[in-house]
Swiss-Prot record:
Changing K363A: 2.9-fold decrease in catalytic efficiency. Synthesizes only high molecular weight levans. InterPro entries: Glyco_hydro_68, Glyco_hydro_beta-prop_sf. GO terms for molecular function: levansucrase activity; metal ion binding. Induction: Induced by sucrose. Expression is controlled by the sacR non-coding regulatory region, located upstream from sacB. The gene is sacB. Changing Y237A: Slight decrease in catalytic efficiency. Synthesizes only high molecular weight levans. Ca(2+) may play an important structural role and promote stability of levansucrase. The enzyme concentration is a factor defining the molecular weight (MW) levan distribution. A bimodal distribution is reported at the usual enzyme concentrations. At low concentrations, the enzyme synthesizes high MW levan, and at high concentrations, it synthesizes low MW levan. This is Levansucrase. Optimum pH is 6. The record marks D247 as: Transition state stabilizer.
Amino acid sequence: MNIKKFAKQATVLTFTTALLAGGATQAFAKETNQKPYKETYGISHITRHDMLQIPEQQKNEKYQVPEFDSSTIKNISSAKGLDVWDSWPLQNADGTVANYHGYHIVFALAGDPKNADDTSIYMFYQKVGETSIDSWKNAGRVFKDSDKFDANDSILKDQTQEWSGSATFTSDGKIRLFYTDFSGKHYGKQTLTTAQVNVSASDSSLNINGVEDYKSIFDGDGKTYQNVQQFIDEGNYSSGDNHTLRDPHYVEDKGHKYLVFEANTGTEDGYQGEESLFNKAYYGKSTSFFRQESQKLLQSDKKRTAELANGALGMIELNDDYTLKKVMKPLIASNTVTDEIERANVFKMNGKWYLFTDSRGSKMTIDGITSNDIYMLGYVSNSLTGPYKPLNKTGLVLKMDLDPNDVTFTYSHFAVPQAKGNNVVITSYMTNRGFYADKQSTFAPSFLLNIKGKKTSVVKDSILEQGQLTVNK
């Protein structure tokens, strides 16, 4: 038995009893000599107070994903027989869309609609200047089945699916892909992974000529970011926990290379567990709000989910050869709020750093947020490493609440910075996979989001073509 862990649980139990009896802080201090604590661990937090403001705030149309006309939505013609969902463009170091020999490139997850385990990365491309969804061509799968074995990597050989990531156009004209190696063989082990993708160009097409320098980068250290062994030790799926270490997003700053990614906090920066419910830093606002909200949470059916909620947008520094150089603190964490903040995305715009993430209401512990609610949250800082403050006072940037069965349901919203101006293009996928015989998961119509300092708003009447990446304004 872990005596330290047992002692910590006993302390928490005493405080829980005191709170339920209405004694709050004074009773707890008298019985155990300890008090509710406030520990930020030197990172920014998505607080319960901010999130509780969102159900009212989201009624404003400037935060709402536009309504789309289902009769105009097309499957991707070059992806016949495939659902296509999470996607990301080949980007320059500053986040703008790269021009690769006259083409824009998008990497996307795709698979057989009838087989939920069929998840691989495909490469799509479109001539610069074209915007129609029918102009997207399909170069096929990035990786051959044999590549993971040929890489001579002990983690890669157990990969069963390829999950989301990012891609950068390097200064020497190469395509460097980052993605998530998912292994169904090891309780959902997830590993940040990279490869150079060799692509040849002609006047009419792009062709994948294999990959090289294919290797694992990071699978969690346990201290800063939860690893799969901790998930297993605590009961794996039966525990109700949700282990994440995925969606690597590449970014450069001042000559340094980094990955920002979805994760869960580790044992040294605010781990999951009942004791986390008594950290004032996770609640925000004031001590009186903490007392009221913590008592309510302790008596609610969301208590167990909140205990396990320790989502984070993590960060590591890379060497020039894209190996791990340094494990860094998370940019932001969502302890007690949600265990899952996805599709990490960060870029510099007009002198500020903007950090975005997608999340589902069904994974949250906030009153007033429903299981159908879909969000893109956003944060702003003067530096890449933070501290980050919520955009629009709460972090709400986009909200969508369509039934998952709706053809125009969208998720995986991704902000693409433009070369000029204050608008970014929002891409996403439309239609959940495997729901319809004739409607596949496809590129959703893009639209514009305006960013000015600490505020954002959806630009009215700004719906673009399906999968459109850039605007000439």
